[in-house]
């Protein structure tokens, strides 16, 4: 005996499942996570040109050493919080509140030719962001501290796409 297939129920179930899947994907990648292919060398060697970055948009609490995506897809490492004093000397040594931070960055921190003057106190509601490749000064050294509401997300992991 053949059973009669109810096409309306079948198509309705497929439509509901497809709609739920689309909603879950929209919430995941439109609200919670941000996917971006990184272009540039200012975060080398931590983040390389062509890496796929996944950042968490919901995080609004950022600590020192967090790598964040901000402004128009810029990526940088937070080195100072609101109220901290940042100083960079002529030898390329950075001091936060008078102390040299324990960093694994192999590059000296150079001053920007134009930009802020030192010592610099990070304003309330902002963070001081530096590139890992410290010769590239397109970060807080040129553009002042970044407002926390301009941070798009905290980098939670990345996928190397070339040049392992």
Task: Give the location of each predicted region.
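Generic structural signal for buried aliphatic residues
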Residues: 53, 68, 86, 127-128, ...
